[in-house]
Amino acid sequence: MKKRFLAILAAVLLPSCLFAQFGVVSPLHVNGNQLNDAYGNKVVLHGVMDTPSPYFNKYRWGYSCTDNNISACISYYDKIFGALQNPAKGTYCNIFRLHLEPGWTNDPNKKSTGSDTGEANISRFSASRLQKYLDALYLPIAQKAINHGLYVVIRPPGVCPKDLKVGDAYQNYLKTVWNIVSSNSWVKNNSGIVSLELANEPVHIYNRYGQSSATAMRDYFQPVVDVIRKNGFKGIIWIPG
C-alpha cells in the first residue's frame, strides 16, 4: 500500500517538475522549440510590453523625457511590476518587454529629416543619449522587473521603416544600438534572464540591389547578430521573421 501511494504521488508530482517555478528567473536557453531554464525546466513566457513614455503612460510620472523625471519613472515601473506578478491577486506575468523609448534617445536639438515618419524616423537618434539612459533609466527599470521575478526582453527604439534594404541606414542604426546595449556589462551578466529583440515590425526586406530575395532577411539581420555575439552576449536573440 505504501509503495502504491508513493508511486501515485510521484506520478502526480512529475509533470509539475518539468516546468519552472513561477516567479523564479533562471537563465533561459533554447532547446528545440522550447525554452528551458538552467535546471532543464520548461518555461512558458507570458507578460506585457510597455515603453517609458510620458504620453503613453498618461503622464503618471512626469511630462517629459528629462533627467528630473528619471527617479519617478523607475518608481512607477517598480509598482507596476509588483502588480503584474502577484498570484494572490490573480496576475501571473513572468516577462516584461521593455521598449527603449526614443523620447529619451532622440536629441531634442536635432531637426527631423528624411521621408520616414513617426518612430521609424531615426534622424534624431543620439548614440550618446542611448548610452546615458541605458545606464540611468532602462537598465534600472529592467532590474526592478527582475527583482519582481520577471524576465526582460529589450527591443530597440522605434519601429522599422516599411522598406528595408541590406546595407541601408537602418541596418547600421541597429548595429549601433545593439553594439551599445550588448557591450554593457550588466546586460552581459544577465544573459539568459535578459533577451534582445533585434527589430520591431519589419515589413519588406530587400537585398542590397533593392530586389526581393530569399536571403535578404538573413543578410540584413545576421550582421547585427554578429555584433551582439562578438560583444559576448550569450542570451537569447529574438529575430523577426
Model-derived regions, located:
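Positively charged n-region of N-terminal signal peptides that target proteins for export
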Residues: 1-4
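Bacterial N-terminal signal peptides
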Residues: 7-17
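Active-site mouth of glycoside hydrolases
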Residues: 23-241
